[in-house]
Amino acid sequence: MLIGAGERIAVPGRADMTYRFRAHSEYLYLTDRDRPGGILAFDPHDGWVDFVKPVTRDERLWEGASTEDEVGVSVVELATWLERRRDRPIACLGAPMPHLTSMDGLVADLREALNAIRRRKDEVELARMRAAESATSAGFAAIAPLIEPGRTERELQIELEAAFFRNGGDSVAFETIVGGGPNSAVLHFPPTSRPFADGDLVLVDAGAEYRGYASDITRTYPASGRFTSEQQEIYAIVRAASERATARCTPGIEWREVHRIAATTIADGLVDFGLLHGDPQSLVERGAQSVFFPHGIGHMVGLGVRDAGEVLPGREPSEDDFPRLRVDLPLEVGHVFTVEPGIYVVPALIHDAQFRERYRDAVDWERAESMLDFGGMRIENNLLITDGDPEVLTGDVPLVA
């Protein structure tokens, strides 16, 4: 078995620049080494060999790489290692190694075996995740008092990320999302110079990374300091969905059941609000809530913002049963998940002809049309599954009252 770290990727048109390197999570998990070009090899008869790429003079000149990065066996020796095993099947994990041919079935089996180990976080991993959460919490604390009409999405991003780095974060776990007003309805909106207006919702989805381990938090704020009555009603529905889904995150529960609880809570709330019509459970069976809750309830987080093997082998997503749900497995002690319900008024979905026909009797389309400038709301926390109630790792980041 070979597990590749991956190589640097050049920035197009810039001969001496590369994107920030991050080793493939499978390699990083097994070696705790974040250098390009490494290949970890395993033979059940002979054990592990860590093949590393020699540090070049240019790397020392431009990047400050040291001989400490060369601890291991030179990758030049990999050819000899492979030649001695040329009659045996190879499985290549980690970053792609197109010059080698591996057995797909063997790769799938080994990857799932590794995923099963990686899903359950040990104390070292949890310590790193808590450090990432701490930096992220500091970032959200820094921006909360700054949110006001006239402030821009970009300004918030700058202050948030600066606080991440001041408080121990190594990098951002993913591209920071800040959307104000109608932009808050775009699930992954990149910040712009748009200033917040009076009455806007401001959605911030961000996280720091520490030694490869990620945090992923979302909060939604009123730009004016207080929600309007309409915004407060929707926020209460999202918060109820978050609390009920969180309470259900216990060992043995199927993730799709957690999603179902959140979806039903949202459907129930939107019936009372007047955007949906009908029995909440029947609406969820039809998927009507997805007009306003168009994503899954969450995902695994850990070594990267989307962690290991979120769908068990043999389970295929069903187009008839939560088609947007990307996680399908039972919860176990040591798993870490995001729980992130939201409600959005997305013009593209409100104007979608197929949705209009499919849910013509389930959605108050006229009411939805009147809310096209509403934007969106999401609450996202990171949960550690324990023997008892789940531990909210992101509990230091306050919700809006």
What does each of the following model-derived ranges do?
Residues 1-401:
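Active-site neighborhoods and metal-handling regions in enzymes and metal-associated proteins
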